[in-house]
Each structure stands twice: as C-alpha cells, then as structure tokens.
C-alpha cells in the first residue's frame, strides 16, 4: 500500500510579483509550500520572473495582463508540473482581465481565484463583481458535479461575516462587505464547499489582509478576504488550515498574508 503524504497548498496575493520578489522568494524558502496560487501579479506574461521561481525548485504556469499589468494569476508547484486545465473562468464577463487559472497537480484540481474588488459600490465595477461571482458559482457547481478532488483558493475580495473584520462598522460602505457580495459567497459555500479556515477556526477572528495605513497590522485591524474552499472529495482529506502572518511584518511586503491548507494524499 502506497504511503500517504501531506501537501501544503497556499494562496497569496503578492500585490506585484516583481516589486515583492524578495519577499516571495524568502517566504517560499522559509515556509516551503508544495503548491502556491499567486494573485495580483501586476506583470505581463513576459515579465513573470520564472527564473527566480525555478531556481527554488518550482514549476509554474501563469497569466499576466497587458498593457497596464494589473491583475494576473499564477500556480507554482514543486510536486510535479501543473497540467493547465483553464486560463480563464468560463463565463467571465470580461475575459481581458486575468483573474483565474486552473491546473491538475497531484490528482487535485486547483483553481486560483482573484475576484474583482468591486469598488466603488454601487456602480459598474460592483456589477462586474457580482457577474463574475455568478460565473464562479456556475463553474464551481460543474466541479462539484464532476466529483473530482478540487480546491478554489485565492483572493475572493469578500468579507463573509462580522467575525471576519476588525471593525465591521468601518467597512459598511465597501464593496468587500456589501450584502450582495456576502450573499454570493454564502451561496457558493452552500453548494457543498468547505471553508477551510472556518472548519478549523469556527469562532476565531482570523485575518488575511491589513491595510498599509494607521499601523493596521500592528493593531491587528484586519479583514479576511482570502479563502480556500474544498470540494467534498478533498475536504475529507483536510488536515489543517491557517494564515502565515510572518511575511506581512516584513519590509516592502504585500498587504495580504498567505493562507494555507494541508491535505493528505
């Protein structure tokens, strides 16, 4: 009988991969994740620092976004080449924006999510956010119907509940905390997905993002907008989940911290 092993899968909004490359490579060396979904690359396809990634033993697939180099998503793996299955979310109302990439790695289908911010709310950007989440719902249901072990990990740009924010009253007018956005997230989870952080930390205030201003990180004035949702076939193999706050305290770092799950395969 083949021995089982644990895989650590992380999601990290790097907020500019080239400007934070030292942060990323240091974190990869120290935390040693097996698979990583990166969001907000802010680079073109040609500008992705593949040499630095490969030097640390990772293979990668990515999709940048020209010409202004916003958005961008990538999947890194040191446990086998990612077999790309999608470079965009089916039904995305704006396919020019790089917000989703998907691959099979070690028998797991990994969808890397970078949902629209949606601000200002109300307005066309918020309308796009809701339409994008509708497309995610449809694809997520297809994944569940397929019965494959799957994870949708990344920056959802949704604060699900009051427990996921330091001071809810300060976010009442923000698209990340809008009732319609929260409802979309609840409906997604209700399809049958497991929110990994809440599975292990049901009553704790766990944050993944702290604004740069007003010493938010030092005061732990954060929000939880980065999530990992696991299909039933993978959730039964879930062994742990958390947030690595360490790199958020480094110099010239992202305003997000990486969140992670461990699964046994």
Outline where the language-model segments fall:
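Structured beta-strand-rich core segments of catalytic domains in phosphoester-bond hydrolases
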Residues: 41-44, 50-120
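Internal catalytic-core helix/loop-beta-alpha segment
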Residues: 87, 130-144
